[in-house]
Every structure is written in C-alpha cells, then in structure tokens.
Amino acid sequence: MSTFKNCISAAAAGVMSLALALPAAAAPTKFDFWFGLSGDLERVVQTMCKNFNESQKDYEVVCTSQGNYDATLQNTIAAFRAGKQPAVVQVYDAGTATMMLSGAYYPAGKLMSENGYKIDWNDYFPGIARYYATSKGELLSFPFNSSTALLYWNKDAFAKIGKTEAPKTWEDAAADMKALKGAGYDCPMAINISGNESWQLMEQFSALHNQPIATKNNGYDGLDARLEVNKTKFVKYVTDLKSWYDQGLIKIKSKELGQDMVQAFASGDCQMIMTSVGDHGTVGKTQKAGMNWDVAELPVYAGTERKNSLVGGASLWVLSGKSADEYKGAAAFLNFIHDPKTALFWSTNTGYIPVTNSGFEFMKSSGFYDKAPYKGREVAIASLTASEPTQITRGIRLGNFTQIRAEFGNQMQAIFANKVSVQEGIDNLAKNGNAVLERFEATYKGKQLP
C-alpha cells in the first residue's frame, strides 16, 4: 500500500475513533397534540407544528387531527382511561365545563411557571379569557383558535337603497330588508336554524343584550343552573326573525337545502348574513367577481347598551399523567403559540383572530388590517371588547351544552315549520335542555366548578 493510501486509512480510522468516542446527540423528546380541525385548517396546524419543531432541537410535537371537536373530546376521554392520552389537546368552548370537572388537566399557569416561562395572563382579551377561566378568573387552559360573529353586508346592494352603512339596530335592519326586497333583491338576509347556529342566533344575541341563557350566571356559579332563555328578549328576537321569514325578507340557507349561508352571500344571492369572522377569508376567496362587501358588528335592538360579544372556538388543555420532559415540551410549544409572530401566522392563514392584546398590536403595526383580504377582521376585536364582560357576558358554563345546541336546532325547525308557536318552541328548548342539565348535575353530584 502506498504512503498516500496509508495516510488516508489512518485518517479515516482516526475520524471513526473520534466519532465513536463522542456521545450520540440526544433524540428530541416527543409529545402528542390532538386537535379537532380538518381540511385547510388541519394543514395550517400541521405547518405550525412543523415550524415549532424546526425552531428548536429539544422537543418534537406530533400533531394529529381527530376530525372534529366532538370526536377529539370523546377520543381524549377514552385515551385517558386507557392511559394513552396526549400531552396537549384542543377542546372546544362547549367542552369547557366537562374538562374543568374532570380534574384530568395540568393548570396552564402552573405548567408555565414551573417550566420557567413568564406569561402575562392579563394580556389576553377579557372577553376571550373569561370564557375559559374559573369563577375566580384563573385560566386553566390556553385560548387558541378564537372568533366571534359579525354581520356581513353587500355594499353594492345597500347603495341601491341609498345606504352606505350596515344597520346598527334590528329596527334599521328590518327597514333595510324591506327596502332591499322592494329594490328587487329576493333574499335580503339569509340565516341557518340548525343546532350549530345557536352560537350566532341565541348565544351572541343574549350576550350583546346582557340577557341570561341560564340561571347561576349562565352556569358559572353552580351545576344546578337551568335554562331561562324562554323568559328573555330572545323570545322577541325569534318572533321577529319568524315574522321577517314569513314576509320573505329572510331565507333559510343550509348545505342540506343546496346552498349554505356563506355561499349565498359570496355569490351575491343574499345581501346579509350573520356568521363567524372565520368565514371572512372564505367570502374573499369565493365572492362574485367585483362584489363590494364589508363586515360590521351584529345589530342590537334600539335603546340597548351594547355588551361584548362571545368568543367561539377552542382552547388548549395540558393533560395530567405525562412525564416531566413531555411537560417541558408542552410548555415550550404553548410559549411558541403565544408569541405574537405565531399569532400573525395563524390569523393570516386561518381567519381566526389574535387572542392577546400584544398579538393584535403586533398585527396592526405590521399593517395586517390595512387592506384586503384582511381589512375588516379588526371589527371582531371591537365586538369582543365592546364592554368589560359582565357576569352574564363572560360566557356560558353549562354541561353537555352540545346537546342543548342540538335541541335549539330542533325547536327552531319546529317554529319555522309552524308546528309550534315561538313561545312554545322556546319553552320546549328550556324544558328539554334542563333535562340535559339535570343529568349532567347528577353525573357530577358532589362536585363544584372551579
């Protein structure tokens, strides 16, 4: 063997010996995050997870969609019983009471402080934080994907009736709908009356008018809360909606009927809808070419002192029973999500709103709201912060609330099909909903909400 080859062989042997002598790089600690978003939103979550994993080398989050919110909660309960629960899980607003009573979580504040992170909990918008907070104001989970309902209106159609602003009151909205009908528009406003629309129609209306949905401050003060929405201004509201429907001023739109509300508005078929700010991007991408439209806060009845609207969406819970290393990873992940730059990424790609004041200010300073397609989404923040949350407008803390929402849909269908009167339908909602609450109270007998 030549001297040159001997040198190469010796060098290679030396490198090999050095490599064997060095300790192997530690593999990152893996932990699971389960969530309920699908489609485009699932892809955005997966990108966010990828961004976190690439931002550091110590932890790797494995993000798995469970398909929808209900499945996520049910799968998490089953996994917890089998000792296979994820470290972090996304739980929708209606599941908050169940999570609080489960005791199966690691409180958000405790997690972050014990892992060396300083979070300004007062930075969260009150209208968002208090929906997920305990009765004493402590956040047990991290608000995540958040939205509220807005009025979408067709500026071109309103120009035909001499209007340049959206209606601020329901009295004005009624007059505008009649004028639009008179101007030849077949569908001045579209609504959906399914169970999912309880959030837009019953919950938002009640909050804006400071009207209770249930006793015990909407359930925050005890599991013995019972529905009383059949005794509030909500009855008048449904009466008016039904009257406007009978007059042809409102059309019911849904996927089951061939065209959902958002499609009906974006196509120019209907001139007003009430839906989530999360649909803002969808309208922008699918609107009829050249259509001028905007968003506004939902109307209230004349003489009403407007209160904050309610947040919708979900929060992130850290579950008990995981290792210290997994908790370190979970804390790092939640701190990453809390960063204003992540808020900008999230809102840009989803339509959800920032949950903290610092995130909102960062987005404003970045020019996010200055022009299309994002201009107008700041109205959602104005709606959520229209007032300091009251004992009623901080949120709804009722057990098995998804079942109550479904019952809302059943009774609204009966009302609009003339099977029952408005009062009878809402009385039935209260009666059947209270049976749900009684069963939930019995299940957690002896327990108290934190």
Predicted regions, residues:
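Extracytoplasmic/periplasmic substrate-recognition and gating elements
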Residues: 27, 82, 137-138, 159-161, ...
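Short, well-ordered beta-strand elements
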Residues: 27-38, 59-64, 88, 140, ...
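Extracytoplasmic/periplasmic solute-binding protein
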Residues: 135-144, 149, 174-226, 242, ...
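Short, solvent-exposed loop/beta-turn-alpha elements that line the ligand-binding surface or hinge
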Residues: 109-124, 211-236, 285-288, 299-308, ...
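Long, aromatic- and glycine/proline-rich binding clefts that accommodate carbohydrate-like moieties
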Residues: 293-300, 348-410, 414, 442-450
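Glycine-centered hinge/linker elements that transmit conformational signals in sensory
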Residues: 176-179, 220-254, 298
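Hinge/lid segment of periplasmic solute-binding proteins
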Residues: 94-148, 200-207, 294-296, 371-372, ...
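Extracytoplasmic "Venus flytrap"/periplasmic binding protein-like
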Residues: 51-124, 131, 156-168, 263-264, ...
